[in-house]
Amino acid sequence: MKFLANLKCNHTRASFREYAKILDENLSANDDVSVFAPASAFDEKKHMFRLGAQNFYPCESGAFTGEIGKAMLDEFEIKDVLIGHSERREILNESEEFLRSKFDFAAKNGWNVIYCIGENLSTNESGATKEFLSRQLENIDLGYKNLVIAYEPIWAIGTGRSASIEQIDEVLSFLKTKANVPLLYGGSVNAANIADIAGIKSCDGVLVGTASWDANNFLGLIGAASR
């Protein structure tokens, strides 16, 4: 099972060193773990986890103030990238067109893409979730060999309110009919619900936010998944 930690706008360079040290001392070679750290915390060490980027601009380098280009990621041998997270869609107004340009750039470079999709509460309550997710997936090449899709219902992100096991299973099973790629669930994943989520046949892993920010808490979640 895949365990992806999205640290978002958390951890300094110093605190991430401690975070990484705890993971390195406790993870095994059999653990499939990626950590999407803030760019200021990137390092060149070899870890027991894959280091990923929360964001990038689709360029080698250039006049793009505040952005992160391929040359910068290459320095740290980063090949895993998040695209389409709802916080970037909503807060930073990343459009479907721009997300497509990011996806195409990542695919051209052979990166591992974790493409995030998810509906808001009104869409969910109106029963239009599957149609909405289908439209989001029309934006990318579902045949790309290094694609992972992360389903994160917006109404469950950082709210403490996770989708029910039945809801997650229904949506991920539907997505399996759309794309033969690994599927992740994200949205208030924690140590209390991870075992049930891990038991969903169509679920290949989790994208964890708040519960991953503390290294020991994240390790506890990983351990709880196999109990």
Curated annotation (Swiss-Prot):
Main localization (coarse): cytoplasm
Positions with a binding annotation for substrate: N6, L7, K8, G158, S188
Catalytically driven reaction(s): D-glyceraldehyde 3-phosphate = dihydroxyacetone phosphate
Top class in the EC scheme: isomerase
Disulfide cross-links: none
Subcellular localization(s) per the UniProt record: Cytoplasm
The keyword Membrane belongs to this UniProt entry's keyword annotation: no
UniProt-recorded Gene Ontology molecular function terms: triose-phosphate isomerase activity
Any one GO CC term of the record: cytosol
Record-listed E.C. numbers: 5.3.1.1
Superkingdom in the source lineage: Bacteria
Family: Belongs to the triosephosphate isomerase family.
Assembly and interaction partners: Homodimer.
Listed name of the protein: Triosephosphate isomerase
Organism annotation: Campylobacter concisus (strain 13826)
Upper classification of the organism: Bacteria, Pseudomonadati, Campylobacterota, Epsilonproteobacteria, Campylobacterales
